[in-house]
């Protein structure tokens, strides 16, 4: 009965199981123990039959599915992973080969280099777009107008022109644009502050482009640029101020030597006669009112007698005179006549007639007309000495001006005097400006007054009642509060004749005609 039952189970198992191998395995397992010994059929029949039945059912359900899943998973893995890896590697190799074939060179750092222009690109796509600039290829075309582009992004931005689409809109107003950077620039207009500030006039702007446009019109900025350029030129030519402070030797009780401010000026102008340089700027002692165009510097700076202040004042005056030269134009300046210097005299130095004065012991002349001055100039070709006797009382009343005015102005010679805080070392003839040096050929200066004899002729006060510095033109008798404007005005006077326009060469009869000519700007060039 047990054998039949077992056989019946076997037959049943054979009928139910889809494969015969599982049934045979079940039979073999029932006939053996884990120890390899044969168990009795009566003892192991029920337990082994139940276990084998359960295992056979589970294996019948799992094994076909697991094999199919394994096959499918293997097929899918091989079809997805391996082709992706192979395709990426092949694509990279193909791109590298194509780029190398087209002119791309792989660098050791992984970047690509164009063999046409040597441009280094970070990747193959960038190099591919760059190569189109050499080949002229534009694969992206607009269907509406036919415009072609090298990149797809440029085509998409171009299509927005036809559709009128403006996706970037301002949250504060109705402004809309097609590009993000344009919206970013527009949003700055709604900001409260103005970060872009002009350092020369103090104006502020919200955009840098507006500041750059302002600099093209900013007078202070343009003036500073010209002054810096002139200062760089003068730094190579102007000697230091210590060289200018030469002592004034006294020859004897009756003869004094007129000091020359900068001897290097003669050597400099000998090689360059067509240009006017600020070789001997005037120096002023006392409180000096300096006006700067920079907002970060106080407008009123009172400089004392320190040496640094004097050097700073001299440097600014050099720049101001060069600015006047730039304003007037170098082509309008007339060249000077330079005579060959002679040997040095025993008592005093001998210099060119273009920068010297002849002091006769018995008389002092003031040429009235240009003819007399020309005749006087012809007599000055020989050695010229700067030695002159000390002034007489009647000569002290003469005007220190070199204006070469007509005889009708002689009665106002007392008004021509200019006060320099009672310091005779600041006489205009000692600290000469370039205009005074050129005019010395046409006029003879009055002698220098003794210390303490000069008095303040005029005083200029501001709105607060404080006395301020003023500069007087000895030729036109005009006061200037700004030294730059004073220097520009002095540059309008001729070198030889103060009443001759230094711009166009027009010769005026008197100072009124000269002032009218300058104010009206009636310059005619022949």
Swiss-Prot record:
A cellular component term, taken from the record's GO annotations: nucleus
Transmembrane regions listed in the UniProt entry: none
Compositional bias ranges of the Basic and acidic residues kind: 61-77, 368-379
Region Disordered: start-end pairs: 28-94, 368-435
Tissue specificity note: Expressed in outer hair cells (OHC) of the organ of Corti. Abundant in thymus, low expression in bone marrow and brain and no detectable expression in spleen, liver, kidney or muscle. Expressed in T-cells.
PROSITE patterns: ZINC_FINGER_C2H2_1 (PS00028), ZINC_FINGER_C2H2_2 (PS50157)
GO molecular function: DNA binding; identical protein binding; zinc ion binding
GO biological process: positive regulation of transcription by RNA polymerase II
Localisation: Nucleus
SUPFAM superfamilies listed in its UniProt record: beta-beta-alpha zinc fingers
Function description: Transcriptional regulator required for outer hair cells (OHC) maturation and, consequently, for hearing.
Subunit text: Can form homodimers. Interacts with IKZF4 and IKZF5.
Protein name stated in the entry: Zinc finger protein Helios
Species this chain originates from: Mus musculus (Mouse)
